[in-house]
Regions:
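Beta-propeller folds
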Residues: 22-259
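Positively charged n-region of N-terminal signal peptides that target proteins for export
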Residues: 1-6
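Bacterial N-terminal signal peptides
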Residues: 7-16
Length: 259
């Protein structure tokens, strides 16, 4: 009886091995397709009604992502914003992320994102009004992919953002843009942070609206007392380039910050 049990166990292991061997592993599956990609929920946002959330899901027909809503109790799915409604010059706008206004009537669509330090924290922002269907780009005339951390005012009548280390406020009804800080530079940083604050403290977004929407509190960083590290970039061109950035070593001075 023992011999029979061992024989059956051997056959089971052998059949499992043969089954695994039959599953061909290709470079295309690993690097080109999402066959072994991590599964998750993209950019989940809790809705104002407290019974549903929104998320992003790929629309294969359009080649971009829909913004969809799920009822948490029933699981019912509905498309809030189809990708076909978010078009520019005949092409769908590729959503990297999105931000709701407090009343869920407006949305900021974040796209064309570029990497800053570890994460893609600068890009372009578009305004979507779900009541009127209006869809337009903010920051008209500004350099592409340079806006950071855009956010609605509490009344959703204005949007504030960082552009080249200065803070701006844009009126959504008139399009008028007001610059709030003027000393932003490679050494003076308003509304965001230098490398060490992101790397060691995990903070990137450096400003907030006041509850009444009349003021903005922001971090101001002065990196002039911090030593400069020079990184060699050998990947963006056939010729290397030097990238300087403030990099405090152990025992040296960090950037000076204030709110």
């Amino acid at each position: 009886m023992r011999i029979v049990s061992l024989f059956l166990s051997f056959l089971f292991v052998l059949s499992s091995f043969v089954s695994v061997q039959a599953q061909e592993l290709t470079l295309e599956d690993i690097y080109k397709t999402r066959k072994y990609g991590q599964r998750g929920v993209a950019s989940m946002r809790w809705m104002k009604d407290n019974i549903s959330y929104s998320t992003l899901e790929m629309n294969r027909e359009v080649g971009a992502r829909d913004i969809v809503r799920y009822d948490v109790k029933s699981g019912q799915r509905s498309v809030l914003v189809p990708a076909s409604n978010l078009m520019h010059e005949g092409e769908p706008v590729q959503i990297h992320d999105y931000i709701w206004s407090e009343d869920n009537t407006k949305m900021l669509v974040y796209t064309n994102s570029q990497r800053v330090w570890r994460d893609n924290t600068r890009g372009d922002y578009w305004l979507l009004d779900l009541q009127t269907g209006e869809f337009r780009q903010l920051g008209q005339g500004l350099d592409p992919s340079r806006m950071m951390f855009a956010k609605f005012s509490p009344a959703a009548d204005k949007v504030a953002y960082v552009y080249y280390n200065n803070i701006y406020v844009e009126d959504l009804s008139t399009g008028e843009r007001t610059q709030l800080t003027f000393d932003g530079s490679d050494e003076i940083i308003n509304g965001n942070f230098d490398w060490v604050y992101e790397e060691e403290l995990g903070i990137q977004d450096g400003f907030r609206w006041s509850p009444d929407g009349k003021s903005i509190a922001y971090w101001h960083s002065d990196t002039r007392g911090t030593g400069v590290f020079y990184m060699i970039n050998n990947v963006d061109s056939i010729y290397s380039s030097v990238i300087p950035f403030p990099y405090p070593k152990a025992g040296t001075q960090n950037s000076a910050v204030k709110v």
